[in-house]
A protein has these predicted regions:
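Alpha-helical scaffold elements within enzyme catalytic domains, especially in hydrolases
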Residues: 34, 97-99, 168-171, 242
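Asp-based phosphoryl-transfer active-site loop
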Residues: 4-21
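Short hydrophobic/aromatic-enriched beta-strand-loop microsegments
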Residues: 63-69, 84, 129, 233-237, ...
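Mg2+-dependent phosphoryl-transfer enzymes with acidic/Ser/Thr/Gly-rich catalytic loops
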Residues: 2-7, 25, 188-271
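Conserved acidic, metal-coordinating active-site core of Asp-based
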Residues: 104-217, 221-229, 238
Length: 271
């Protein structure tokens, strides 16, 4: 029997990582080696930026591919493959709009290799978010953001408002946005048309593959487009109920090494 897929895509938080934000490096090395022997690509599809993911996968990153910032920046074996930035003026307006409607909250604005957090937010909250950035700085005024491309905004707010944030902004703007519930209290905003699903579609196309060649694992709202795209889609047992409705299969929880267990089962059957 040969494996039914040629590429693996995994979300990070709540999926590939356990609740301590860790994974078994030795086990992963063995898994990755087996996939390399079979010509299978291992892809991380995350709302995290590449600068953070390189730290997460130190010693492995050059053997992998990445769909970062929910599909805004694509990396193949350490090299930029494509990127899809937001409109700067729209970003600044959205930051004002959301704060005016929902009040002050922890917010991150992601550029290529750095994320910015506003100084008026409590330091403990900033430090928590900074972990996900990998490289961050504090800014006093969003208007002072460097002129570099902006790829994502993450709002630390109840994710039930994601659809409202998207709808309210898109109603009055030509340059549209997409808003995803990335966690219970986090909303990621990207340029319209960008998602983990579109990112994987574009990445796989560069390799001569489609969603029919993909197995994917996720737990959060921003994983739904990826699960819809993949022929072999797994929601984690610990995932959101709405996410499970978009998956063909359920994997054991992230705390039970769910991704590894499912993938190892496929490898064990490929003898």
């Amino acid at each position: 029997m040969t494996l039914p897929f040629k590429a693996v895509a995994v979300d990070m938080d709540g999926t590939f990582l356990d609740d301590r934000k860790q994974f078994d490096h030795e086990q992963f090395d063995q898994l990755l080696t087996e996939f390399e022997k079979r010509g299978v690509h291992f892809i991380v599809a995350s709302g995290r930026p590449y600068v953070r993911l390189k730290q997460d996968f130190k010693g492995f990153a050059d053997r992998m591919d990445f769909v970062t910032l929910n599909g805004s920046r694509l990396i193949i074996k350490g090299k930029d493959a494509a990127s899809y930035p937001m409109n700067r003026a729209d970003v600044l307006e959205l930051l004002d709009d959301v704060q005016a409607k929902y009040g002050k909250m922890a917010t991150m604005v992601f550029q290529k290799d750095i994320a910015y957090l506003h100084s008026e937010i409590d330091k403990d909250e900033r430090d928590f978010l900074a972990y996900f950035a990998g490289n961050s700085d504090v800014i006093d005024d969003w208007d002072d953001l460097p002129e570099d491309d902006i790829y994502q905004i993450t709002f630390g707010m109840d994710s039930k408002h994601a659809a409202d944030v998207e709808e309210a902004f898109n109603k009055n703007h030509e340059n549209k946005i997409s808003a995803f519930a990335s966690a219970t209290f986090a909303i990621d905003v990207n340029v319209k048309g960008v998602s983990k699903g579109s990112g994987l579609e574009r990445l796989l196309a560069k390799m001569g593959m489609t969603g029919n060649d993909l197995i994917a694992f996720g737990d959060g709202g921003n994983d739904i487009p990826m699960l819809d795209f993949a022929k072999y889609s797994y929601a984690m047992a610990n995932g959101m109920d709405k996410v499970k409705k978009h998956a063909k299969f359920i994997a054991p929880a992230n705390t039970e090494n769910g991704v590894f267990r499912v993938l190892q089962k496929y490898l064990d059957e490929d003898k």
